[in-house]
């Protein structure tokens, strides 16, 4: 079925040239607040993920020394879906033409790769863990997205933006890691445990946290993060910067007692 075009709910802007670890941290925290529909023990929860209604997005406008690129991110799941080159007007969408799902961004040109990290890494010809994530990398990403038509450069730059904004918004440890190392002159890599233990589990962790909160009969399965056993949903919640709200978590709880 043809999907509907995404409506943009708000736009946030960030100048990469003057970015510091502190202003980056503040930006991520403000972004979480802008996205929140409610809070669970102080942690923002995203709007209900809805596949029937018109998809909602937000734009992130990034500038560096006069160069501009705007990326469009799906609000319900924080997946980067497209971007706009400098002065081009036309949007480029992360979707292979062969998927036949239609355009999430109206009038967009479909790229040769989809939004998953597997497809992005294949197009970039580089592993997620081999890419650098710091201020230099972000400046380079903005410059490349503003003007480059090279698939490898585009894909690598989109990975940098997705990690440093989408993943950092999802996870406290990832935001802290990027903030602490932002101004490093050496390449800054993503630790493997953050990819394996956190990033690959955000949807599942979100579900477990909200289900535990809504359903007294839900049995929480202990999780392992960085070698530590996490025994409760409240403990797991501490790792999340924002929680995805899946419709399944709102099913009526069992009859307790």
From Swiss-Prot:
Pfam families: RIP. One of its GO terms (molecular function) is toxin activity. InterPro entries: Ribosome-inact_prot_sf, Ribosome_inactivat_1/2, Ribosome_inactivat_prot, Ribosome_inactivat_prot_sub1, Ribosome_inactivat_prot_sub2. The active site is at residue 167. SUPFAM superfamilies: Ribosome inactivating proteins (RIP). It is an enzyme of class 3 (hydrolase). It catalyses: Endohydrolysis of the N-glycosidic bond at one specific adenosine on the 28S rRNA. Keywords: Disulfide bond, Hydrolase, Plant defense, Protein synthesis inhibitor, Toxin. PANTHER family: ALBUMIN B-32, PTHR33453. Inhibits translation in rabbit reticulocytes. This is Ribosome-inactivating protein charybdin. It comes from Drimia maritima. The lineage of its organism: Eukaryota, Viridiplantae, Streptophyta, Embryophyta, Tracheophyta.
């Amino acid at each position: 079925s043809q999907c509907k075009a995404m409506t943009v709910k708000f736009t946030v802007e960030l100048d990469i040239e003057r970015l510091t670890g502190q202003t980056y941290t503040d930006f991520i925290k403000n972004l979480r607040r802008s996205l929140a529909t409610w809070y669970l023990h102080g942690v923002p929860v995203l709007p209900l993920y809805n596949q029937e209604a018109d998809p909602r997005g937000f734009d992130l406008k990034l500038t560096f020394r006069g160069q501009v690129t705007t990326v469009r991110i799906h609000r319900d799941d924080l997946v980067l879906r497209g971007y706009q080159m400098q002065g081009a007007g036309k949007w480029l969408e992360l979707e292979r033409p062969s998927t036949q799902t239609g355009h999430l961004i109206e009038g967009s040109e479909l790229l040769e790769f989809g939004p998953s990290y597997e497809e992005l890494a294949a197009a970039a010809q580089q592993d997620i863990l081999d890419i650098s994530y710091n201020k230099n990398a972000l400046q380079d990403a903005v410059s490349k997205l503003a003007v480059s038509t090279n698939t490898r450069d585009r894909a690598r730059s989109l990975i940098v933006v997705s990690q440093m904004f989408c993943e950092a918004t999802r996870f406290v440890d990832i935001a802290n890691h990027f903030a602490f190392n932002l101004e490093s002159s050496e390449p800054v890599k993503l630790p493997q445990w953050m990819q394996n233990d956190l990033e690959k589990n955000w949807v599942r962790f979100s579900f477990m946290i909200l289900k535990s909160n809504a359903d007294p009969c839900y049995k929480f399965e202990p999780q392992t993060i960085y070698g530590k056993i996490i025994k409760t949903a409240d403990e797991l919640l501490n790792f999340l910067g924002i929680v995805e709200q899946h419709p399944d978590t709102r099913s009526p709880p069992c009859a307790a007692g």
